[in-house]
């Protein structure tokens, strides 16, 4: 983009557009992003809030018959016995080499891309991301538009903000998922993770 998104020149050009709209009795609508999907503010959210994109957005797993030497790299480790699962994450590192039926979960990340200014798309479920997006985009426009909101500038529109997984083998994840699940349903999701993929355990719940 020739004009740096959301810099002083950007808003100066928007002010000129707004004034021309008023002069010609035309409405000027604000699009809340520089591409799509909305939510990353052309990379400004990523830059100001690295946790908005670098803590993972999905969970995947692999099965193992032996706990590998690299088990401490996995996010969550479950041991299966029949249809029951036990969360052994806290002790997994000390049990390297033990045989069993293990489900080893790891985080997956959205790929970086020039489309996202060299970052990846943000996690819209991450606490504070929506507030930071509004602060960096719409609050900036409000300083320029002022009393013209509702007049020459009727409002703004958004374009397909997304909560997506990285592929078909993953489920959506965000840092406070386990805490939010426990607060809402009264039990832990961790030992029941496999039920989100397979018809085992309390998968009907």
Stretches found by the model and what they are:
Residues 4-205:
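Mature extracytoplasmic enzyme cores
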């Amino acid at each position: 983009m020739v004009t740096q998104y959301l810099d002083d020149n950007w808003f100066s050009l928007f002010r000129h557009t707004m004034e021309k709209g008023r002069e010609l009795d035309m409405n000027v609508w604000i699009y809340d992003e520089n591409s799509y999907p909305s939510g990353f503010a052309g990379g400004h959210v990523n830059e100001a809030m690295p946790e908005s994109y670098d803590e993972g957005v999905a969970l995947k797993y692999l099965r193992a018959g032996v706990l590998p030497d690299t088990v401490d790299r996995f996010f969550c480790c479950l041991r299966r016995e029949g249809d029951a699962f036990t969360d052994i994450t806290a002790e997994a590192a000390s049990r390297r080499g033990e045989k069993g039926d293990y489900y080893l979960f790891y985080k997956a990340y959205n790929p970086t891309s020039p489309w996202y200014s060299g970052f990846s798309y943000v996690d819209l479920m991450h606490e504070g991301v929506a507030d930071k997006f509004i602060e960096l985009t719409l609050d900036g426009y409000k300083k320029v538009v002022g009393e013209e909101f509702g007049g020459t500038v009727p409002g703004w529109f958004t374009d397909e903000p997304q909560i997506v997984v990285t592929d078909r083998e993953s489920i959506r994840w965000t840092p406070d998922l386990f805490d939010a699940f426990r607060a809402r349903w009264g039990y832990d999701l961790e030992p029941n993770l496999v039920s989100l993929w397979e018809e085992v355990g309390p998968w009907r719940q």
